[in-house]
Amino acid sequence: MNYQEAMEYMEKVGTYGIVPGLDSIRELCRRLGDPQNDLKFVHIAGTNGKGSTLAYISSILQAAGYRVGKYISPVIIEYCEKIQIGKQKITHKDLCEGLEIIKKHCDAMVSDGFHHPTPFEIETALAFWYFREKQCDIVVLETGMGGREDATNLITTTQVAVLASIGMDHMKFLGNSLEEIAAHKAGICKPGCQVVSMRQKEAAQKVVEQTAAELGCMLTIADVANAKHVKYGLKKQTFDYGNYKKLEITLAGKFQVANAVLAVEVVQALGKCGYEIKESAVRKGLQETTWIGRLQILEEHPLFIVDGAHNEDAAAKLADSIEFYFTNKRIIYIMGMLKDKEVDRVIALTEKYADQILTVTPPDNPRAMHAYDLATEVAKVHPNVTAVDSLEEAVELSHLLAGRDDVILCFGSLSYLGRILKLMEKRQTAGNKRKGKR
């Protein structure tokens, strides 16, 4: 199996349908020798902030000298981003070797009357297999959706269960109330494990506290209100937390301080599990953390920023950041969304800050909302909206509309940010070549 064949196989598997529950992933991992049982995990669930929190925790653990596996969902640029050790993505060779083994087991499962595992179940099993093969000291694991019935929740060796910000998303699968969604997310907690949760909205907070109490878990609340002397910035942010003074992060967004506080509490909880993490590792890890597509600056003049905000909770955080960082700035949006998201709420929370909104259709996604349909929704509340036919056109038009000191903000779905990153890289390369000819 080569890489192209591997991708074709995964695409084909995506057409087989889904059976809820953990039976398929449990059987697949059993046939693989239950690699997850030989690993230790930090398991992260939440509506928003999972990826950034994973990045902070992983970076700190790496700085402390540990061999750290990372399992990420969704990817932004390239498939192999899903599975990483340290800063290295799984190689095409290892990916193909693992998938070849797993495919044989999947075929045998179907012959034995089991449902074929889904792409996410296969990827999760592949990650477990790979991390065991490479002898990771610890794995930082991000749920795909929810928690209780997520394929990642097969694990039983959780050191710390982490709950990032919980809000309304995936209601079709997780329920229509914050309590129901929180119950799914809190389902990653295992009896007696450490639980670290961000301070949640009251309804979700009650569920988290009740779950931890029922399972005999030690619960720590990471409350950003306890961060002192916070200095916000687009390129650097500093804060004090507990005994740590002047911690520094380079990820932008006021909400990133809350994610960093959560990560600090997680590594302190790991200390209670026997992991040795010095203050110098916490500082170095936080400072060196990078994460694609979270208020990420791609260009200075005009200021071109991409952000993965795609639901109500994330849109509220984005609006807060816009208000804080870009007061009195002229702002142009490039906005693309998926049909199953809370499109009306995202529009309501963000439209007032934009002078001009360009809508796009996220490419190669069956759930994509067409640019013209999104423009119709935006037009109900905002007069200056234009649907454009491609991401290339959106990038070019936004630059024609923007002055040197204006802001171009691209958001609405993580699914197309990788394309935007490549388009901007191509644009900058072309610009540098033109400068070189002068």
Enumerate the language-model features and the residues they cover.
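C-terminal helical cap/extension that packs against the catalytic core
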Residues: 198-220, 235, 303-306, 312, ...
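Extended acidic/charged loop-beta regions that coordinate divalent cations
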Residues: 123-173, 205-246
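Short functional linear segments
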Residues: 1-46, 53-66, 70-72, 107-114
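Short, flexible loop segments at boundaries between secondary-structure elements
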Residues: 362-365, 431-438
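Hydrophobic alpha-helical packing residues
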Residues: 57-62, 131, 350, 378
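ATP-dependent carboxylate-amine ligase catalytic core
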Residues: 29, 34-37, 63-156, 202
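Nucleotide phosphate-binding/pyrophosphate-handling subdomain across enzymes
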Residues: 38, 133, 138-141, 149-162, ...
